């Protein structure tokens, strides 16, 4: 049975539609002297786009299968995941409750009210603030219990949509990459932001089956490699088991030099990467995920960290709405 047939066994809503574009960044390639391509998951159809919609195709299908009427999730005030979950809930006629934290402890009005947070109000989300997501799985379980006691039927969507079920969305993305690149380009490396780990794990499983000679590099956005690796491997192994395939921890490569000072705080290298791609390609990155991941790609070229000189694919996971929340830093 092919990977595509195995994936088709899982309930899935069609939220993404057609494959997202895979394009060569010609001006950036000329500037860097290296072939750079981009997978445009920032232009998925709903709520200004982003990678979480792929995960929500499977998670929301499971919620409907279970008869849920409420999606419950958590994240930072400027969470792209919460924004996309809220939009899916609105599209499906479901209630959405979001447990939010302020991970950078800022009182800047733009961060607290603009960007993704503004969109949550438009999507009519019930927002519950907390001091911090120290144990998000437990905190979400407790919140779901309270919501259930009010007569609702909650479905918990994990932080980032990152569990083995949500990560199926990035096996689908790997299928798209393989189909779009076939006969056109052979990627030496793929670079992606690695945060809640589901996107990274899904790509790890999918690419190992479809493009086993391609190196996958996760640029961490919130923690050091020794903390991130177990998170990626845990989802990778659960996902591989559910699909009946083999995917080994040896395929998990992490670069952790680019997320300082902490998750959610922009840094100089990330902001420079945002500016570079905007000026050369008219494409918007974000200061939390893709800006830092692109900074890793650029520095990786400078430091000759890639294993060879072949073409590189950058996975654009979205996040541009957060730009407005980080003004005037951006």
Swiss-Prot record:
Upper taxonomic lineage: Bacteria, Pseudomonadati, Pseudomonadota, Gammaproteobacteria, Enterobacterales
Listed name of the protein: D-cysteine desulfhydrase
Domain of life of the native organism: Bacteria
Organism name: Yersinia enterocolitica serotype O:8 / biotype 1B (strain NCTC 13174 / 8081)
Quaternary structure annotation from Swiss-Prot or TrEMBL: Homodimer.
InterPro entries listed in its UniProt record: ACCD_DCysDesulf (IPR027278), D-Cys_desShydrase (IPR005966), D_Cys_desulphydr_bac (IPR023702), TrpB-like_PALP (IPR001926), TrpB-like_PALP_sf (IPR036052)
PANTHER family registered for this protein in UniProt: 1-AMINOCYCLOPROPANE-1-CARBOXYLATE DEAMINASE-RELATED
Cofactor: pyridoxal 5'-phosphate
SUPFAM superfamilies given in the database record: Tryptophan synthase beta subunit-like PLP-dependent enzymes
